[in-house]
Amino acid sequence: MGSAPAQIPTSFGHELRACLRCRLVKTYDQFRDAGCENCPFFKMEEDHERIVEVTTPNFNGIISVMDPSRSWAARWLRIGKFAPGCYTLAVSEPLPEEMQHLCQEERVQYVLPKRM
């Protein structure tokens, strides 16, 4: 997972979506064009229906992280090993079970969201 920076959202508002696994925030079009920098195994750029499965427009707050490995906020949010970029503070829905199994197969940690 990444040292290359993730794309910064090109617009703010209703177009934004957050990855349900890593909480990276981008627009639908950005996920369609480049996928998720932290979760390439979801292959969002190849399967556009998957974007709707593994991202959500329902999230709370947003933080920009330039150097996740040195940011106390990134460590607190457990995103210290992810690519620099914009992240949500919390998502309220879990990753679909099928995608949770994919994370297990890829040996990638997935933590269920806390109840809000």
Swiss-Prot record:
Keyword set for this entry? Activator, Metal-binding, Nucleus, Repressor, Transcription, Transcription regulation, Zinc, Zinc-finger
InterPro entries according to UniProt:
RPABC4/Spt4, Spt4, Spt4/RpoE2_Znf, Spt4_sf
What are the record's GO terms for cellular component?
Answer: nucleus
Q: Where are the zinc fingers (C4-type)?
A: 19-39
Spell out the family assignment given in the record's similarity comment: Belongs to the SPT4 family.
**According to its UniProt entry, what is the function of this protein?**
May regulate transcription elongation by RNA polymerase II. May enhance transcriptional pausing at sites proximal to the promoter, which may in turn facilitate the assembly of an elongation competent RNA polymerase II complex.
Annotated protein name in UniProt? Transcription elongation factor SPT4 homolog 2
**Species in which this protein is naturally found:** Arabidopsis thaliana
